[in-house]
């Protein structure tokens, strides 16, 4: 589709596992939706702030050891938080993960495992996760920008 990561996004990948970086670099070339990297490696202090604010549900984040990235969707210079665009980014990440043979989990479908193995679309997998959480009487935690190595 002709998208490229900005220098800022490339900088955010510093310290991230090489296999995950390669998936992100492949996905930006495959995606229908432009995206940038907002988080790669995180310090313990950054993680604590996110945990305290409720924006993260764990202090054992894979960001702490370079095994996770957060990707934000762009339309021109505007950020989009619409879930459907993250489905598209996930589809590109899944194809890139297949090509690079890297197991990746998506933060909008925690229960669904490796994105390379999804049956159907990323949206289908997210909906399966939401249905599962609701059937358990639990609220789903949708972190659509988040992708982590398994």
Model-derived features with residue positions:
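Generic, ordered loop/turn and secondary-structure boundary motif
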Residues: 11-14, 42, 51, 80, ...
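Active-site acidic/histidine clusters and adjacent loop/turn architecture
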Residues: 1-36
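Catalytic cores and adjacent binding grooves of peptidoglycan-active enzymes
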Residues: 60-150
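A general structural signal for well-ordered alpha-helical packing
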Residues: 21-24, 47, 68, 90
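Extended, low-complexity, intrinsically disordered C-terminal regulatory tails
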Residues: 25-53
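Active-site-adjacent substructure of cysteine-protease-like catalytic cores
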Residues: 50-62
